[in-house]
Amino acid sequence: MIHGIGTDLLDARRIRAGLARYGEHYADRILAPAEHTRYYASRDPAGFLAKCFAAKEAFAKALGTGLRAPVTLRNIAVMRDAHGKPHIDCAPELTAFLRERGVTAQHVSLSDEGDFVLAFVVLEQSATQED
């Protein structure tokens, strides 16, 4: 059963401007600890950061909470499996929060074209979970 659907469309120029103005501190406010290695290894750090930010926003929208504790940018890590498929890894407190709400699965899709990044997240819950 669908718990929630979230989408986010982001103009990556906003992220580039933030990096230009605030430097790596800007990235540190967005990235979860698990994302830093891939960020620094990326050929396009601003593009990487834009995709992470959009996915996190879409995740918060699918959850229906917005970005507020424990649903914070640094508690949500956008990761990739061995085939490149994106998924969300959550910090322990966020994992517990999801479990309390009956969220059992998640699906993430990311796309970009030019300066625009699109993220789409679907969260599932068990059929016995009440709204």
UniProtKB/Swiss-Prot annotation:
Its EC number is 2.7.8.7. GO terms for molecular function: holo-[acyl-carrier-protein] synthase activity; magnesium ion binding. It catalyses: apo-[ACP] + CoA = holo-[ACP] + adenosine 3',5'-bisphosphate + H(+). One of its GO terms (cellular component) is cytoplasm. Pfam families: ACPS. It is an enzyme of class 2 (transferase). This is Holo-[acyl-carrier-protein] synthase.
